[in-house]
């Protein structure tokens, strides 16, 4: 009898853990409304949207502040595993190309906003060429309105490469490869 109770208890624990893990890893995606471009619309050559977001000090920041630079807008979240994989590459690209007029702009889509991002930035260090480094590029807080202006998101990470003249030249949904990222950035510098 004890054996049956132990087996049933173990199965119940596994079921509860599976349900919890599934809910914790789901991406909450809002379908764009109205006349917003759909997520699969090709953005190539379209002007980057005029957007305002909050920086980590609570001040307004705009995409227009980066005009004249090549900008990789990266929508991410602290709980997103593929985002975590690509962050070291973004740190490296920021180091490598910043002097040539490039920057990464990380847009956190965490529902908890600053409350989730601040502890993550304070704690996390990423392996970049054998060094443990913090995120070295600007991070702002995004929301559904910002995502809609970019045409909506199907998940995270989603990145947009914006040329010096403010046009979207590349969109990548999901994890971008290191080689693809390097090639795309270098094509704009």
Residue ranges and their predicted role:
Residues 1-50, 171:
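N-terminal targeting signals for export/organelle localization
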Residues 34, 155-189:
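Thiol-/selenol-based redox modules, centered on thioredoxin-like
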Residues 45, 50-71, 94-97, 150:
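A short beta-strand-turn-helix
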Residues 67, 75-92:
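Conserved redox-active cysteine motifs that mediate thiol-disulfide chemistry
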Residues 108-110, 141, 172:
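Residue-level recognition of beta-strand->loop/alpha-helix junctions
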Residues 118-164:
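Short, internal strand/loop/helix patches
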């Amino acid at each position: 009898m004890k054996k049956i109770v132990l087996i049933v208890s173990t199965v119940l624990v596994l079921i509860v853990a599976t349900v919890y893990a599934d809910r914790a890893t789901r991406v909450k995606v809002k379908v764009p409304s109205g006349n917003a471009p759909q997520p699969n619309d090709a953005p190539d050559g379209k002007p980057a949207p005029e957007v305002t977001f909050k920086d980590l000090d609570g001040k307004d920041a705009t995409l227009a502040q980066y005009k004249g630079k090549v900008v990789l807008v990266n929508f991410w979240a602290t709980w997103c595993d593929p985002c975590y994989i690509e962050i070291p590459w973004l740190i490296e690209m920021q180091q490598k190309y910043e002097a040539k007029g490039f920057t990464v702009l990380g847009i956190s889509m965490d529902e908890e906003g600053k409350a989730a991002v601040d502890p993550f930035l304070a704690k996390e260090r990423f392996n970049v060429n054998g060094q443990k480094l913090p995120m070295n590029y600007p991070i702002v807080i995004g929301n559904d309105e910002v995502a809609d202006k970019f045409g909506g998101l199907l998940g995270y990470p989603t990145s947009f490469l914006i040329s010096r003249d403010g046009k979207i030249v590349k969109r990548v949904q999901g994890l971008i490869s290191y080689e693809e990222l390097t090639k795309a950035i270098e094509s704009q510098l």
